[in-house]
């Protein structure tokens, strides 16, 4: 049986921010190609700041816990500040939003947290496109594959 830490179990049993946002400024969906988990993310953005974030899911405990933590941590964040620095710095900043809270994730489940960050970038890219911020939108889209690459490098170190 897969052993999960108490933080992951807690977020799975009582996930935060589950639901939809009516008329979201940003929305994205992802189907994890590794396991089939699905996450949909909705963002309410005002003056370039994430005011609210909610998600719907069909997935395992780690997928749910990742989205629960991420939607809590992303609130109040200024979008432009999230993208300051090199691609590696931006990826690390976004990954840290869940990693620091969830603790150790079983190696067999390391494919779950990247999906949450990827769906966030997809949601933000949609918002930035509507706002006419094409350069920042392109950067958000270009970071999506780098999230999984980041996690794969971590797996190789173990």
Q: What residue ranges belong to the model's regions?
A:
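C-terminal binding/interaction regions
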Residues: 1-22, 28, 77-80, 84-158
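Structured beta-strand/loop patches that form or line metal/cofactor-binding pockets in enzymes
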Residues: 10, 18-47, 54
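Short, thiol/selenol-centered motifs that function as redox-active sites or metal-ligating centers
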Residues: 35, 57-66
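Helix-adjacent hinge/juxtasegments
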Residues: 43, 51-53, 70-72, 81
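Glycine/charged-rich beta-loop-alpha catalytic/anionic-binding loops adjacent to active sites
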Residues: 44-55, 93-102
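Alpha-helical support elements that line or immediately flank enzyme active sites
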Residues: 62-80
